[in-house]
């Protein structure tokens, strides 16, 4: 489906109000993503094929795509797991002096990158994070919370988003 809202209207009324990913979160076996770049989409499709056809998992994927023309960068090294799990650092801040952490996904990510450039021009360091799936991050957080509760607090796994952002200021 085309994302809609931030650029051209989505394909079909269900995509024009921006809540299709919220609706997708209510379906337990729906894996939803809102990628920006071609390499993100490639990693997601490869993962989907592996899970659905090789591993025979009973899941399906809902992926929103964009309808704008823009340059797609090469995939940074080592981001595949982050793409699959829902978040990865796209751009490290130029300075470690309390950098701003900017998160974006889908159509808005490119504007987030522009905001980081503007902040850098004002001597404000900014890191950019691509959030490919808020739903997968939520699902992981809930699973960690559940495991902690079921173990009586003996196990306390850290959600992936916390692992990624905890060293950020």
Residue ranges and their predicted role:
Residues 30-31:
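Short active-site oxyanion
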């Amino acid at each position: 489906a085309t994302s809609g809202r931030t650029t051209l209207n989505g394909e079909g009324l269900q995509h024009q109000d921006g809540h299709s990913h919220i609706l997708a979160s209510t379906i337990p076996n729906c894996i939803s993503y809102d990628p920006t770049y071609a390499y993100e989409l490639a990693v997601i499709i490869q993962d989907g094929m592996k899970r659905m056809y090789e591993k025979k998992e009973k899941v399906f994927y809902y992926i929103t795509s964009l309808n704008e023309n823009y340059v797609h960068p090469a995939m940074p090294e080592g981001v595949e797991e982050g793409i699959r799990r829902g978040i990865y650092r796209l751009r490290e801040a130029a300075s470690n002096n309390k950098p701003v952490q900017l998160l974006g996904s889908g159509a808005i990510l490119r504007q987030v990158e522009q905001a980081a450039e503007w902040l850098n021009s004002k001597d404000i360091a900014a890191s950019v994070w691509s959030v490919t799936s808020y739903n997968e991050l939520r699902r992981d957080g809930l699973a960690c919370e559940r495991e902690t509760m079921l173990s009586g607090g003996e196990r306390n796994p850290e959600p992936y988003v916390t692992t990624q952002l905890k060293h950020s200021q």
